[in-house]
Amino acid sequence: VAAYYRKVLNIENFSLNTIREPGEANGKRSNIINCVDDNVKVDLGKETPESDQATMIALKYALDHLDRDEIDVLTLAPQGPNAFFTEEAGSLVEYLGKRYNTADIMSILVSEKIKMGFVTEQVKLRDVPHQVTQKNIFKKLTLLDDTLRQDFTILKPKIAVLGLNPQVNCGQNGDEEVNVIIPAIERAREEGIMAIGPFSAERFFSERMYEKFDAVLAMYYDQGVVAFKSVDEESAACYIAGLPVICSMSLTDPHYDIVGQNLGDEQGLRNALYLAMDVCVHREQNIELQKNPLPY
């Protein structure tokens, strides 16, 4: 596949070091492990069942090496909407949750200006109210707080919580705010988590209130992602929290319409790669700091 693209794009003076295992990698060259049959069909600028199958093979292969500590981090390049979807597990986040036997997993959008987690992932809007429960909000607040401390070295994270209903903007809380969101926030504060809210999403972002917080917890994906990208899309990437391994991904769409024209922007993938590297360093620092603690 790589050779095909190199030929189509007419890339000269560039060679790939084909290896079989991560330990064979040459630090001075671009290394590649071929996970699929060399005869796999390539349709330039198209997502096909064959490409989706090859994507899942590569993902499983990389995770196997990650689990064996043969690589340190995993960064996913832009993919089509069905690339990481399986009938057995569902979406990528659901697949990773089942692979590592954990339900406490969450996509966190990360940029230089804002970090955002979600109570629900990319589910149908009609299913959102059923998933916005005290238990789920508390679990996500706990996970977000732990992640900010361990993976981003923020000692006392301050987390803003968005409301579910628009009338929060008028100082009026709906049933979900009164009976679900506020009790979850109060429980989190009892556990030492600095959670504040609920805030109206419109007012929160229009008045730039996010600048006063280390992270934001949105109730559902569409509530937060558009505002997040309007604040800072240039430095953005996605981090998948709650896993024993480090996994990040680009927020950039694959843009199949410009494939082969040398018009793509690599910044989104670069952001995801640097994010994974930063988290890796932070985890190592935390491990080192927790060694040989002084007695009380």
Locations of the language-model features?
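Anion-binding alpha/beta catalytic cores of soluble intermediary-metabolism enzymes, centered on
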Residues: 1-296
